[in-house]
């Protein structure tokens, strides 16, 4: 934390910080309490987005198969609809959690992007893993339960 604050103090052009060192909400709060000219973004797949927003983060910068959901959460929160933002966030948490599985996050996200027409191929280069049939079935089940297009 001190290093980030020292860097920000040394160079006035450094105004935006992306936090990915857990726990992000209290760290964001401490950074912003020390320097209110900073803009802090969360990361880590959006897992702590609501808590980061509550601590003063301006948004998140992360990969996610449905980025429009994260945009909706941030817009609601920033417009004053904190309850609506929280409801959307908690409704989507199972997908955020599922997509953030270590080593599987990129193949899961690429499969979602392919199904949504954003990319042509979901293949992950070596040494990245491939998704097994069970993981794909779990993803399909989750997307169906959330009412999100899976194909």
Indicate where each model-derived feature is located.
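Short, structured secondary-structure boundary patches
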Residues: 62-64, 80-85, 106-109, 140-146
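A generic structural signal for well-ordered alpha-helical surface patches
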Residues: 71, 90-93, 107-111, 137
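Short alpha-helix boundary/capping motifs
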Residues: 59, 79-81, 113, 120, ...
């Amino acid at each position: 934390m001190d290093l980030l604050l020292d860097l920000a103090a040394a160079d006035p052009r450094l105004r935006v910080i992306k936090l990915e060192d857990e726990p992000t909400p209290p760290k964001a709060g401490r950074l912003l309490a020390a320097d209110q000219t900073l803009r802090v973004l969360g990361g880590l797949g959006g897992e702590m987005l609501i808590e980061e927003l509550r601590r003063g983060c301006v948004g998140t910068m992360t990969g996610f198969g449905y980025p429009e959901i994260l945009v909706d959460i941030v817009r609601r929160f920033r417009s004053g609809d904190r309850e609506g933002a929280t409801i959307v966030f908690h409704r989507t948490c199972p997908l955020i959690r599922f997509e953030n599985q270590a080593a599987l996050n990129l193949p899961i996200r690429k499969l979602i992007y392919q199904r949504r027409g954003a990319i042509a191929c979901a293949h992950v280069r070596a040494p990245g893993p491939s998704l097994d049939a069970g993981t794909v079935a779990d993803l399909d089940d989750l997307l169906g339960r959330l009412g999100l297009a899976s194909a």
